[in-house]
Amino acid sequence: LGMAGAVLAGSLSSPLMAAELDEVVFGTNWYAQAEHGGFYQAKATGLYEKYGLDVSIEMGGPQVNGMQLLVSGKRDFSMGYAVGAVKAVEQGMPVTTVAAAFQGDPQALIAHPHITSLEQIKAEGLPVYIAAFANTTFWPWLKSKYGYTDDMIRPYTFSVAPFLADKDIVQQGYLSSEPFAMEKAGIQPSVFLLADYGYPAYATTIETTDGLIEENPDLVRRFVQASMEGWASYFKDPAPGNALIKEANPEMTDEQIAYGIAKMQEYGLVTGGDAATRGIGVMTDARWAKIHEFMLEAGLVDASLDIHDVYSLDYLPTEPVLP
């Protein structure tokens, strides 16, 4: 009887413990991949539970409007992008960016090996294949900093086939995605990571609603803390996070994940810049001022916007999560 009682008590304790966790829905910006690894790692290794959270991760994709899902209350947190966040707040969305997992944007221009600089692309007037979103993010920056012109633009359809067929094509790409496909096809492309040339945007940010911040600031703080600990853990041993990534996105291969991790580390996207000394996820007023300045210069945002309405530094880890 004692044994049966113990078993019964044991089976009861799990749901009771689960009931004490705050349920949270976090939406990513694309299908599961290495660039989301820290969040999946925090879930896989129990870091979210350690901070009293029961987190469901929902994938983004081409048809998913993350901002809409966040503002409508279907998600508590959303993976965002600094430039998009500024626009959202300007349009009256009640959202705030509370952390940045990536100190630099993984967006790059990719060219064939004989192209050695961003200046050369302009000098030779090469066609640059970009997606529509580039017009309100990095393209205006390339125009103001490098003199690129709109007549260089060609529409990018997220296929590297045109690039592989023509040595004079330049295209946008994600550091760990298109170059991987090109290398598989036997080309070692020139990759110009825009962040390395001064493009100021934070990426893979955590956005939440002003309502949640008001209602439960402690929950926001715990989600940020656990997520950034997840990133530190992911770079030490990514296996737990990778298992969840592949479960969510069965088309993702081990090789592609390994390439993604290698590129994040090589370019210090998560652990470089301010994060190296001030902890993963860190944001600064100075950096947001640069983002604001670029957007003002490019005519992407109205002068009436107060940049401090876009972000808050109050929910960053109190104990920095050093890489």
Region locations from a protein language model:
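Secondary-structure end/capping motifs
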Residues: E215-A298
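Pocket-lining segment of extracytoplasmic ligand-binding domains
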Residues: V83-G84, F158-T253
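Sec/Tat signal peptide C-region and signal peptidase I cleavage site
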Residues: S13-A18
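N-terminal export leaders
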Residues: L1-A4
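Structured segments of extracytoplasmic/periplasmic soluble domains
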Residues: A42-T45, Y51, L69, G73, ...
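Short, glycine-/small- and polar/acidic-enriched structural segments
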Residues: A19-A165, I169-G173, F192
